[in-house]
Amino acid sequence: MLFLFFGDFKASLIVGASMPISLFLTLILMSMMGFSMNIVTLGSLVIAIGMMVDASIVVIESCFRRQKSTPDLKQAALEGTKEVTASIIASTITTIVVYLPLATMKGLSGQMFEQLGFTIVFAMLASLIAAMMLVPLFYTVFKPKEKENLPIDKLLKKFTTWYQKILRKLMKRRKTVVGVAVALMIGTVLLAGTLDMELIPAADEGVVAVTVNFRSGTTLEKEDEALKLWEQIAEEEPDVEFYSVSISGSSATLTADLIKKRTLTTAQIVDKWNEIAAGMTDMDVTVTSSGSSMSSMMSTSSYEIDLQGNDRAELAQAAEDLQAEIEKIDGVVKTENSLVNSTTLAKVVVDPLKAMQYGLTPIQVGMTIHNVLSGMNPLTITNDGSEYAVWLEYPEGSYDDLNLLMDLGLDTSFGTVVPLRDIAEINYAQSQETIMKQDGLYQVSVTSTMTSEKIFDAQNAINDLVDHTVFPDSVTPADSMMTGMMNDELQALLQAILVATFLVFLVMAMQFESPRFSFMVMMCIPFALIGSFLLLFITQSTISMVSLMGFLMLMGIVVNNGILFVDSANMLREEGMSTEDALVASGSTRLRPILMTTLTTILSMIPMGLGLGDNGVMMQGMALVIIGGLTASTILTLILIPTFYLIFDKRSRQERRAAKKLAKSQRSGKTGDAENE
């Protein structure tokens, strides 16, 4: 792409050399910080590569322009670099300050993107050093020549001529331009409201986890027998490469690793197995996609609604009614109610007086029953340095019936045997496996399992159902753990965006020595969102923590073109040009470097935007936001910046005329008073 615009191998090599040099310096700084190569740091390097050449392109373009009036290469390199030094420093700093809040964030966002922020900061500093020190040096050593009459130059000349004509017409219709831009912005906001939201996009890592929860007291043999069904399902699935099973207590997990070239995605296999699990009423089965990345924590096809209340009976009824309504929603495979997961307990109540007659205590009776039902570990055998626990159990089926248990003979202290039924009775009761409370209130969770294709539609339908359901006075909906985490992280990101906006404004105010020009450039940031939201909508992507990170990064990139444009226009006005002529000339001269810097960044983002690789989808939203935002901002910068410039300049002239008129009237008043005296 560089060679396409320059048409000179040496010029392309000079600019291209800034990438490996900047990358090398970045890796050194990353190593000093103790960063590792992972999906986040590699993704940040991909993002940074496209921006590493921006400053170098601006510098060499300026050197080429200076060489036309200054034959001496060294002089052209010095003057060309000096001309854009302030602009590229300001542009680099605006990019850096955007990532500073990112690098200092806490919580899940900080864990995920702290290294991303620091890595891009290191890359921008390294690219600035390369652009200001190495590009002018290489320019004088390699002596590149700007080729003319290139195919791209012919297109650019035609486009520049057309742009100049259009820009002059649009500058005379400033209200229309602003009105159309605002209308597009409003339409984009409405479009953004149709996009689904999630915390982190789920990566397809090719791992499916089946978690089976059994009722407490279920023997290992029965658990193993139940799991054989899932083992058979895994064996019959052609996309499963291998699987493993682990059993611990009353739960078991089957983890299936899928082949690389599979016919179904991980989400489709999860949906398929969830439909099978929905028909299993004798066990609680949860099927999810799994993996090693942080996204696996979020990649679930279930959605949880929590209810709170101080009346447990009303809470249970409200949860049961809500569960029944949720089951009617399209896309919901099954629902679970945490209060429904109760266990029927058979309590053996020992009469202490009757037990005392036989020299027994309730504790002794309880220990005997425990040993009979669960077995006991009387001794441990050591053989060749290894210890083996000896476990004694009654034969299977000896006491699996309450009548048999009540016939259990207990040895008394008098040397006789008494049946358990003579000193105890059986009472039945329902007992919750788990009783949840939060802030002193009972809490129940209604969990819905949905198909991956309709997960967001089902979630929206469930939320609408909860919003329109009239609950008893003692029952109120509460945020689930995942919803609370999502709200906290999104709020932290929005705060980071606000801090970054303020820092960018301060940097530009110092650069232009005027808050007016800074505000003018900042106004282009919201309009860049037009392209971002439009591309997210076209690709049916979600708004997530990762895509919001893209919005944050977009701020630092978008203003760079605006800084170059305004800085160039101010310099031309200082040389005596009129405002309109300076804006047209600035747009014409900055057109090629703006297009080059934008295209290099966009092209570097395309592989990430396509979501290539198993984990590519995780960073895809960020790339789509930047690609769409940069495309829109480049077009709007060339049109809106001149329009805003004229509007602000007109107001500034009116304010100056009003100030002069006021000062003149004050002087006239003082002169009249002096004459009267």
Residue ranges, per PLM feature:
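Transmembrane alpha-helices and their membrane-interface boundaries in multi-pass membrane transporters
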Residues: 49-63, 84-104, 111-150, 254, ...
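Helix-loop junctions and hydrophobic alpha-helical segments within the transmembrane domains
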Residues: 16, 60, 65-93, 113, ...
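Beta-strand-rich non-transmembrane domains
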Residues: 316-450
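Hydrophobic transmembrane alpha-helices and their membrane-interface caps
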Residues: 4-65, 506-589, 595-614, 639
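Solvent-exposed, membrane-proximal periplasmic/extracellular interface segments of envelope transport
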Residues: 222-301, 356-373
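Transmembrane helices with small-residue packing motifs
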Residues: 32, 36, 103-111, 181-218, ...
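Extracytoplasmic/periplasmic
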Residues: 198-261, 275, 312-345
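Signature of alpha-helical transmembrane segments and their immediate interfacial
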Residues: 84, 151-200, 667-677
